[in-house]
């Protein structure tokens, strides 16, 4: 029987002298989450976030839980507005080694990303160890990023605020989260623009993960463990001006000015660590 994991939102101070109120505690049981069945996320609580009405505010803030005794991240909680969004370029986050960080390449791509709980485009956090967990590429790009983009686009288009909370859920003392609970509700329009509550699975199709340690292996057709593939480079096209990277076949590459194009062969993880972000069109 899995343990009931309280979403204890006792939020630590991120910046010295900055005060933040803890959000009400919410309990959520991983046993209530259906087993992964091929989709990156599942809707929770009829897509309604667990926020209390008293939490909705137009005052922007961001708070990140202190690491626990195992070095694991807890809840990240914010009221996202334009005033929190980054004004500068994304910086390297390679200095952070989140719990369970045992990274291996499969098919030329690293299994894990340093996943922002609250995406860089929302609050501009770079190498904040309280906001980075060990997460698969699949969870990061297919599961979390579409919801982050939804919130970012809404805030930029309306100048409204969005109450936003991401909670990693762990089974027992596992170092790698089984997934993350993502909640969001737009403030000024009373959830008309943004309203979701989803659980995103921390899985990678075709790869087995030992969540206790972060170790991984390739799964064969019959489920047998295969040896890890030899690391190999992948071809990308970089735009140093926008800090985006693309697949060579991406339509955006054709429109790129020659002086803004750099051909690159290497790992996706290295690009993310250097502050590049994937193109939203080709999703490399």
Spans of model-derived segments:
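Sec-dependent signal peptide recognition
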Residues: 2-10
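Residues immediately within or flanking Cys/His clusters that coordinate Zn2+
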Residues: 12, 130-133, 276
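C-terminal motif of bacterial Sec signal peptides marking the signal peptidase cleavage site
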Residues: 13-17
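Bacterial signal peptide processing site
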Residues: 19-22
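N-terminal module-boundary/linker segments of secreted carbohydrate-active enzymes
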Residues: 24-66, 234-236
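Intrinsic-disorder/low-complexity loop/linker signature
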Residues: 39, 46-47, 108, 173, ...
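Domain-level detector of nuclease and nuclease-like folds
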Residues: 50-227
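Mature, structured domains enriched in cysteine- and short glycine motifs
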Residues: 222-284
């Amino acid at each position: 029987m899995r343990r009931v994991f309280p979403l204890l939102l006792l939020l630590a101070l991120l910046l010295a002298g900055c005060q933040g109120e803890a959000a009400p505690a919410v309990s959520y049981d991983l046993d209530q989450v259906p087993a992964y069945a091929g989709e990156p996320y599942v809707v929770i609580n009829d897509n309604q976030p667990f926020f209390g009405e008293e939490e909705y505010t137009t005052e922007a803030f961001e708070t990140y839980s202190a690491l626990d005794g195992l070095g694991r991240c807890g809840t990240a909680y914010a009221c996202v507005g334009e005033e929190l969004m980054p004004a500068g370029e994304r910086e390297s986050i390679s200095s952070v080694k989140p719990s369970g960080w045992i990274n291996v390449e499969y098919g030329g791509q690293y299994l894990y990303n340093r996943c922002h709980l609250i995406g860089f485009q929302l609050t501009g956090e770079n190498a904040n160890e309280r906001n980075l967990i060990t997460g698969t590429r699949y969870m990061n790009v297919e599961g979390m990023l579409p919801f982050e983009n939804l919130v970012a686009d809404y805030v930029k288009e309306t100048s409204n605020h969005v109450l936003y909370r991401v909670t990693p859920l762990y089974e027992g003392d596992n170092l790698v989260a089984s997934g993350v609970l993502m909640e969001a509700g737009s403030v000024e329009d009373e959830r008309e623009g943004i309203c979701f509550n989803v659980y995103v699975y921390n899985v990678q199709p075709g790869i087995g993960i030992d969540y206790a340690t972060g170790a991984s292996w390739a799964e064969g057709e019959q489920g047998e463990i295969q040896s890890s593939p030899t690391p190999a480079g992948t071809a990308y096209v970089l735009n140093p001006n926008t800090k985006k990277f693309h697949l060579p076949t991406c339509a955006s590459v054709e429109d790129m000015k020659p002086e803004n194009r750099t051909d690159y062969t290497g790992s996706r993880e290295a690009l993310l660590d250097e502050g590049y972000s994937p193109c939203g069109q080709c999703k490399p």
